[in-house]
């Protein structure tokens, strides 16, 4: 019989619903508890999905929980994942792994040191389209790829997200939040980047998040 991993979720915000909806299709892990710095959010989530509500410290100390799902805001991914690894648990984090490259490398090194697994979204490159493209490239059916181009445009996170404020803070924004989907796909198809450059533009100095 396959082992069923007991998972604790930290961060009961907007994206948590997607994970709860999707995890019912898997038989090798089960979300059994949730935590949030906003205790009311954790209690609401626990009631909705019939699981335990805990504090962050409680969920990290629970010996029955082997894996933590880190769904906090991007600015907190590094600190929360580090606490999880130091608590002796495996961690899967929403993207990005960290908002700074060196901190991401530190987490990977810490996981190796403690012989724990660390995983990170996005997993969308494993979808049918991405895998078919990789198959065509790896088989040399379409020749050597010289250029990859990915474009993402939408009216703004404030149009759908209940709490978009973190997008407008330091270490937030579309490159950090949405960029990983496209960077991950391009790296998976074409290999690691040898050189990176960037350019930004601020269209409006003042934005209204909610009216």
Predicted features by range, described:
Residues 54, 92, 117-119, 149, ...:
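Structural detector of well-ordered beta-strand residues that form the stable sheet scaffold
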Residues 33, 66-67, 147:
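Short, Asp-centered acidic motifs that coordinate Mg2+ and/or phosphate
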Residues 1-49:
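N-terminal Rossmann-like dinucleotide-binding module
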Residues 66-67, 73-74, 78-125, 140:
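Beta-strand-loop-alpha-helix segment that lines the small-molecule cofactor/substrate pocket
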Residues 71-72, 152:
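Glycine-rich, N-terminal phosphate-binding loop of Rossmann-like dinucleotide-binding domains
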Residues 50-58:
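Conserved SAM-binding strand-loop segment of SAM-dependent methyltransferases
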Residues 124-208:
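Predominantly a Rossmann-like dinucleotide-binding segment in NAD(P)-dependent oxidoreductases
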């Amino acid at each position: 019989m396959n082992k069923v991993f007991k998972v604790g979720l930290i961060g009961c915000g907007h994206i948590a619903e997607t994970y709860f909806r999707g995890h019912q299709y898997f038989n090798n892990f089960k979300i059994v508890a949730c935590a949030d710095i906003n205790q009311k959010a954790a209690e609401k989530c626990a009631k909705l999905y019939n699981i335990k509500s805990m504090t962050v410290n409680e969920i990290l100390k629970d010996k029955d929980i082997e894996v933590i799902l880190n769904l906090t805001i991007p600015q907190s991914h590094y600190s929360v994942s580090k606490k999880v690894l130091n608590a002796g648990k495996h961690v899967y984090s929403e993207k990005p792994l960290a908002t700074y490259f060196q901190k991401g490398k530190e987490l990977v090194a810490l996981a190796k040191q403690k012989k724990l697994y660390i995983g990170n979204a996005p997993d969308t490159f494993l979808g049918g389209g991405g895998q078919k493209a990789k198959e065509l490239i790896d088989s040399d059916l379409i020749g050597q790829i010289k250029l990859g181009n990915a474009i993402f445009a939408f009216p703004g996170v404030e149009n759908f997200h209940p709490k978009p404020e973190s997008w407008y803070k330091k270490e937030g924004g579309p490159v950090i939040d949405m960029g990983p989907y496209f960077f991950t796909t391009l790296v998976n198809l074409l290999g690691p980047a040898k050189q990176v450059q960037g350019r930004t533009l601020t269209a409006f100095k003042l934005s209204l998040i909610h009216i």
